């Protein structure tokens, strides 16, 4: 079965979700981050907790470091953290606080050589988050266009010892309408790096389709807060 990494997005140490990455659509989740971690830890298919510091993604510097460290102590599950990570110093600060993996976004898109350097220093522990509206990459909290094509960029980093590529189709994010199956499958076929699907995943059926498409992991946000998503999963 495909692995599930439930997403916890933080603003002011509160678990929230956005729609299409729009900060104006912020809504608090029904469970606190602490309650969510306890709930997710019950399921064998959950192999990691995915945490994003949303304000850091905009302001380009981490703000929730100490709170995330508290969350790490609540479970045996490993954590990966993203949002505003632009320096090796920040990466190592997270590692020192017990975070197993970090997610690089904007900095890695804008500077692929830097991304390769940190991946070589910490092989398998760095993930690149490629956030695109369909296949056009956006950065800085999904607020800025880059003019970069998803597939052209991935070819630049394909040889780096990354943990994987987290692909989010922004047009699907937070809508519970299903991910972009076609483009995600195309991406998985175009790279030797593991592909992690994110954005719009709503059901066990979506997970099964992604697994058939060659996707290694699904990151699930809004749907993971509903009991119905977990029916039939162990």
Swiss-Prot record:
GO terms for molecular function: 1-(5-phosphoribosyl)-5-[(5-phosphoribosylamino)methylideneamino]imidazole-4-carboxamide isomerase activity. CDD domains: HisA. One of its GO terms (cellular component) is cytoplasm. SUPFAM superfamilies: Ribulose-phoshate binding barrel (SSF51366). It is found in: Cytoplasm. GO terms for biological process: L-histidine biosynthetic process; L-tryptophan biosynthetic process. Transmembrane segments: none annotated. Pathway: Amino-acid biosynthesis; L-histidine biosynthesis; L-histidine from 5-phospho-alpha-D-ribose 1-diphosphate: step 4/9. InterPro entries: Aldolase_TIM (IPR013785), His_biosynth (IPR006062), HisA_bact_arch (IPR006063), Isoase_HisA-like (IPR044524), Isoase_HisA-like_bact (IPR023016), RibuloseP-bd_barrel (IPR011060). Keywords: Amino-acid biosynthesis, Cytoplasm, Histidine biosynthesis, Isomerase. Its EC number is 5.3.1.16. The keyword Aminoacyl-tRNA synthetase does not apply. Signal peptide: none annotated. Its main location: cytoplasm. The active site is at 9 (proton acceptor), 131 (proton donor). It holds the Pfam family His_biosynth. It catalyses: 1-(5-phospho-beta-D-ribosyl)-5-[(5-phospho-beta-D-ribosylamino)methylideneamino]imidazole-4-carboxamide = 5-[(5-phospho-1-deoxy-D-ribulos-1-ylimino)methylamino]-1-(5-phospho-beta-D-ribosyl)imidazole-4-carboxamide. NCBIfam families: 1-(5-phosphoribosyl)-5-[(5-phosphoribosylamino)methylideneamino]imidazole-4-carboxamide isomerase, PRK13587.1. Belongs to the HisA/HisF family. This is 1-(5-phosphoribosyl)-5-[(5-phosphoribosylamino)methylideneamino] imidazole-4-carboxamide isomerase. It comes from Staphylococcus carnosus (strain TM300). The gene is hisA.
């Amino acid at each position: 079965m495909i692995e599930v990494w439930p997403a916890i997005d933080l603003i002011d140490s509160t678990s929230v979700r956005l729609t299409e990455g729009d900060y104006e659509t912020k809504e608090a989740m029904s469970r606190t981050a602490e309650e969510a971690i306890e709930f997710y830890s019950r399921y064998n298919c959950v192999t990691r907790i995915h945490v994003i510091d949303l304000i850091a993604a905009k302001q380009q510097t981490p703000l929730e470091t100490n709170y995330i460290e508290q969350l790490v102590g609540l479970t045996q599950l490993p954590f990966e953290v993203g949002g505003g990570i632009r320096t090796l110093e920040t990466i190592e600060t997270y590692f020192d606080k017990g975070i197993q993996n970090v997610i690089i976004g904007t900095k890695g898109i804008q500077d692929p050589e830097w991304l390769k350097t940190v991946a070589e220093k910490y092989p398998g522990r760095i993930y690149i988050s490629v956030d695109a509206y369909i296949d056009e990459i956006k950065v800085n909290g999904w607020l800025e266009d880059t003019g970069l094509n998803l597939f052209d960029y991935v070819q630049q980093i394909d040889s780096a010892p990354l943990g994987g590529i987290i692909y989010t189709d922004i047009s699907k994010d937070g809508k519970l309408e299903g991910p972009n199956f076609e483009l995600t499958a195309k991406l998985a076929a175009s790279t030797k790096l593991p592909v992690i699907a994110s954005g719009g995943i709503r059901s066990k059926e979506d997970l099964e389709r992604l697994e058939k498409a060659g996707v290694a992991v699904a990151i699930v946000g809004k749907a993971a807060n509903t009991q119905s998503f977990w029916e039939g999963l162990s």
